[in-house]
Amino acid sequence: MPWVRFDDQFTIHRKVDGLSDAAYRLHTSAIFWCARNLMDGFVPEEDLDLVCARLRAPARFAAECVKRGVWHDAHTACPSEKCPAPVDNHDGWVVHDYWEYQPTREKVLADRETKAKAGQKGGIASGQSRRLHAL
């Protein structure tokens, strides 16, 4: 499970501060949803209702997120290196500068693999030490 990171200035950033309450909720929920699903900041249009299930008419608030610059259309290239490349085969949105604070899918998977290998080594070493002490 990846952790979600927020800067302590997040709530007063000029782009976020101008969002309606519903758009703010959608934006923050999208960050959590993207982290949980390893989506690299991409919110597919067909999954928008899943991102913030209690929000009515989420497409309206997605449009507000785009207008305020916290999201952009998934087909639009962003000059920021902190945004994933445009998504060609799906409609949706990208959380702008997602990689500024959130790890990439690739990094999360690599970290999981590293921890799994370390856990296996720890278990082997632990079992060997118990057998040696029993002698």
Could you tell me what each predicted segment is?
Residues M1-L109, E113, L132:
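Positively charged, structured surface patches that bind polyanionic biopolymers
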Residues R112-L135:
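Arg/Lys-rich, low-complexity, intrinsically disordered N-terminal tails that contact nucleic acids
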